[in-house]
């Protein structure tokens, strides 16, 4: 890959990440990383890692953890590998693989955490982007939600956690697939742009082989009075400082 097509984005705490036109990140990834890193993590797998943002945010704050970033895109893995090397994320391991072949490249049944910011749209739903890399990130062209959760269940150890974000309209499907694969939904949080707005995103944690019992957290509001809410300022914290 031509390195001139990448640029470094500050993450705070003296860390940065390389992004490309095809592999960047948004607010949903930052929120998912914050949602996931509240748990005790020794070994985590980020499925569909892209530029690696979720894994790198976890490692920025939990440097002793080990994170395996998995993506089918060689371009994404190249950028993530360069970030790990250039900015000192020594416990990040990039893996270029699809889900079918992953068992040959990564140990199953032993990880504390799987995180995934999946394609939000089903394969044939809505308009698609002509750029195949962007299309793959947004639509389930390479794997379905069912595929992701089935592989997550195999990666996790007993009591390991799956943390995902998704669109509210697919929440029922997400919870059903988790339960069918012995990942019990245990924590749910909705995200709204501001008070009075419909939910924009859902954050969900499921626990492998856990008892039933779902906790619903208070809503997270991105904006208050036209500005970032206090909670968003906390979440963006050192990342925002890196852009000051």
Show the residue positions of the predicted features:
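Short, structurally constrained coil/turn elements
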Residues: 11, 88-89, 179-182
